[in-house]
Amino acid sequence: MARHLLLFDIGNTNVKVGIATEGTVLTSYALPTDGTQTGDGFGLALLDIMRHAGLGADDIDACVGSSVVPSLDPLLRHACERFLWRPLQLAHVDLPVPLENRYERPTEVGADRLVAAFAARRLYPDARALVSVDFGTATTFDCVDGDAYLGGLICPGVLSSAGALSSRTAKLPRVSLEVSEDMPVVGRSTTTSLNHGFIFGFAALAEGVTARLRKVLPEPLEVVATGGFARAVARVSDCFDHVRPDLLLEGLRLLYLESEQR
């Protein structure tokens, strides 16, 4: 029987829960990052997720996560231990990320950024340099040269920017972020103008930043897009070599497997 891993990307907007085998991430689910949730509430939600996937607690070999919300860590640890009988192993805390961290203050780097950079390094070994572009709550660019994490850039995120615009403008509709293959650059209504502004605006952000990074990072260099809006932006931009929406979950899977071999 295949070994299954339960993977957690604990972010500011959602807790992304992935189910993986040793070879691949099979599927993922999103739970809201809810400050009122309890450990038992998370545990019951995890059982529902596994039931939907046709799995039980006995099918899970390990729970592995990455967190940028420290207040949720003890709740999810409780959920895993009580309901799945497995400890939650957190990247950068319980599982070191095997990259040389060249940040001026290494502890300032979010575990999510390190794990995504590590995943890109392992998935694309032929590239000397890699840039991971994560379209999450923030839009982050993380750079790797060989086995060294160099740092990167943190820019506004798609959802946070859309939410800020909607909350400060009385007459503007909410942004839908819908993408079609033949969408024109120029919107002809307020709704399409907003939608196209965000899609093409963030595509231009990615193109501009990656073009600058290509001037300072060694070749061969490959750019990997990830996060919830990676596919939408990639449909209107050719600056990405790869699109891996579950890059961080893949990184957690690989991190755990490497730790088992040490």
UniProtKB/Swiss-Prot annotation:
<feature type="binding site">
    <location>
        <position position="103"/>
    </location>
    <ligand>
        <name>substrate</name>
    </ligand>
</feature>
<dbReference type="GO" id="GO:0005737">
    <property type="term" value="C:cytoplasm"/>
</dbReference>
<dbReference type="GO" id="GO:0015937">
    <property type="term" value="P:coenzyme A biosynthetic process"/>
</dbReference>
<feature type="binding site">
    <location>
        <begin position="110"/>
        <end position="113"/>
    </location>
    <ligand>
        <name>substrate</name>
    </ligand>
</feature>
<keyword id="KW-0173">Coenzyme A biosynthesis</keyword>
<dbReference type="InterPro" id="IPR004619">
    <property type="entry name" value="Type_III_PanK"/>
</dbReference>
<comment type="similarity">
    <text>Belongs to the type III pantothenate kinase family.</text>
</comment>
<feature type="binding site">
    <location>
        <position position="190"/>
    </location>
    <ligand>
        <name>substrate</name>
    </ligand>
</feature>
<feature type="binding site">
    <location>
        <position position="134"/>
    </location>
    <ligand>
        <name>K(+)</name>
    </ligand>
</feature>
<keyword id="KW-0547">Nucleotide-binding</keyword>
<keyword id="KW-0479">Metal-binding</keyword>
<comment type="function">
    <text>Catalyzes the phosphorylation of pantothenate (Pan), the first step in CoA biosynthesis.</text>
</comment>
<dbReference type="GO" id="GO:0004594">
    <property type="term" value="F:pantothenate kinase activity"/>
</dbReference>
<comment type="pathway">
    <text>Cofactor biosynthesis; coenzyme A biosynthesis; CoA from (R)-pantothenate: step 1/5.</text>
</comment>
<feature type="active site" description="Proton acceptor">
    <location>
        <position position="112"/>
    </location>
</feature>
<feature type="binding site">
    <location>
        <position position="137"/>
    </location>
    <ligand>
        <name>ATP</name>
    </ligand>
</feature>
<keyword id="KW-0630">Potassium</keyword>
<comment type="subunit">
    <text>Homodimer.</text>
</comment>
<dbReference type="Pfam" id="PF03309">
    <property type="entry name" value="Pan_kinase"/>
</dbReference>
<protein>
    <recommendedName>
        <fullName>Type III pantothenate kinase</fullName>
        <ecNumber>2.7.1.33</ecNumber>
    </recommendedName>
</protein>
<dbReference type="InterPro" id="IPR043129">
    <property type="entry name" value="ATPase_NBD"/>
</dbReference>
<keyword id="KW-0418">Kinase</keyword>
<keyword id="KW-0067">ATP-binding</keyword>
<dbReference type="GO" id="GO:0046872">
    <property type="term" value="F:metal ion binding"/>
</dbReference>
<keyword id="KW-0808">Transferase</keyword>
<dbReference type="GO" id="GO:0005524">
    <property type="term" value="F:ATP binding"/>
</dbReference>
<keyword id="KW-0963">Cytoplasm</keyword>
<feature type="binding site">
    <location>
        <begin position="9"/>
        <end position="16"/>
    </location>
    <ligand>
        <name>ATP</name>
    </ligand>
</feature>
